[in-house]
């Protein structure tokens, strides 16, 4: 009796080559990285909108004053610069930890 009560014999699953497995793994990693980048961009935009609007727009109206526009531009630039610096530091630390972990694994 085959899988799930079928009377037909179960077919053998095709063996995946090491190249297929590596390609699938690389594709999955790339997709996850892209999704994480998109989530981070959405989070950045949300934070910029929330904080800069609260700090720069004192009296919402039909248009922005020159000072509000300048404040928003400055605020957004600061947030983006900070975000980039934090991201670079995080990536550098993660890379260092990955290299150290790989070195320890090869020693064993």
Curated annotation (Swiss-Prot):
An annotated GO cellular component: mitochondrial inner membrane
Recorded superkingdom: Eukaryota
The keyword Transferase is assigned to this record: no
Primary location recorded for the protein, binned into one broad class: mitochondrion
Disulfide links within the chain: 52-75, 56-71
SUPFAM superfamilies given in the database record: Tim10-like
One of the protein's GO biological processes: protein insertion into mitochondrial inner membrane
Subcellular location: Mitochondrion inner membrane
Function: Mitochondrial intermembrane chaperone that participates in the import and insertion of some multi-pass transmembrane proteins into the mitochondrial inner membrane. Also required for the transfer of beta-barrel precursors from the TOM complex to the sorting and assembly machinery (SAM complex) of the outer membrane. Acts as a chaperone-like protein that protects the hydrophobic precursors from aggregation and guide them through the mitochondrial intermembrane space.
Subunit structure: Heterohexamer; composed of 3 copies of TIM8 and 3 copies of TIM13, named soluble 70 kDa complex. Associates with the TIM22 complex, whose core is composed of TIM22 and TIM54. Interacts with the transmembrane regions of multi-pass transmembrane proteins in transit.
Protein name: Mitochondrial import inner membrane translocase subunit tim13
């Amino acid at each position: 009796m085959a899988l799930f009560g079928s009377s037909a014999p179960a077919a053998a699953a095709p063996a995946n080559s090491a190249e297929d497995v590596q390609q699938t793994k690389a594709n999955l990693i790339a997709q996850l990285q892209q999704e994480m980048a998109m989530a981070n961009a959405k989070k950045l935009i949300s934070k910029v909108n929330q904080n800069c609007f609260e700090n720069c727009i004192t009296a919402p109206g039909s248009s922005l004053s020159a000072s509000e526009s300048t404040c928003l531009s400055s605020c957004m630039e600061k947030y983006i610069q900070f975000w980039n610096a934090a991201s670079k530091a995080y990536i550098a630390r993660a890379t260092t930890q990955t290299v150290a972990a790989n070195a320890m694994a090869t020693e064993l």
